[in-house]
Amino acid sequence: MSDLLDQLRKSGYAVVPSIAKDPDEPWAFVHELVGVWPEMVERQPIRPMARAKSFAGGAMFTPFHTDSQDFLGAPPGLQIMVCHRAAATGGETRLLDGWALLDRLQRTNHDLYESLKRTPRLHRFYFGDVTRPTVADVDGHVAWTHSPMPATDDVGLQLAREMQSEPVIELAVLAGETLLVDNHRMLHGRHAFSGMDRDFVRVLAWFARPLCNDGPGRPGLGRLGVVVEMLAGVAPARLAAREGVSEATLYEWRNRAMAEAKAALEADDREPRGYSGR
């Protein structure tokens, strides 16, 4: 696992043989793969669908972007793509090293470098819009936010021109292989492909600290993290054995967490919609 983290630290990505652990149990899957418990995970099948509008569900060319849906104010640190079946033609992954691009801009286009760090921009994604600088500090290191939608603002247009000069890494990930990408560092995209057989599972993982600097340990969410695993479908018996508690205790944790979340959301619903005191 240390070799894998070293490779991620050095290159920003790694392709490894898929592990036996099923990504249907995403917390345990991430832990077994990289040796670190995530704070949060998001699991999604990536398969082409007829008339899909999103890049994830379509077969169209996908421009460079980051996966930038936040958890507790930060985008996921790691994107994991488990390949069950590659496309017959096309579909290769494209990667661009955002940190290398920043290093170059600091030397050759310092005004744009500063704008990327300081200028809040509207980044449009299918999951919703995000407004923040293109690169921002996350727990002591730089994390990119970049939309696949064409830029219309001056900073975004300049960035698009600069990206055309950057080296592009192209990877054909095959069945039985897993691609890991540092989502804070690397921009990723995909070539168009033909057919409807391409079948991946994507797991996004958020960590308490930057992954390559982290060490083993339990999730910072503690018992709440266990409850979230339970709600995501991990077998209570398996969780109880791992945590050294009874299944009845797990259900007590779940019920308490759900009751407190329900109360908090209902209190939020009772606030006047024009309220801006937060």
Language model regions located:
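Solvent-exposed, well-ordered amphipathic alpha-helical segments
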Residues: 1-3, 25-33, 115, 225-229, ...
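N-terminal non-catalytic cap/leader segment that marks the start of a structured domain
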Residues: 1-45
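Active-site environment of non-heme Fe oxygenases that use a 2-His-1-carboxylate facial triad
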Residues: 2, 9, 13, 42-213
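Short glycine-rich, polar/acidic loop-and-turn segments at beta strand-coil junctions
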Residues: 19-20, 68, 243
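Short active-site-adjacent helix-start/loop capping segments
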Residues: 23-25, 71, 248, 260
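Residue-centric detector for conserved, function-critical "anchor" positions
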Residues: 212-278
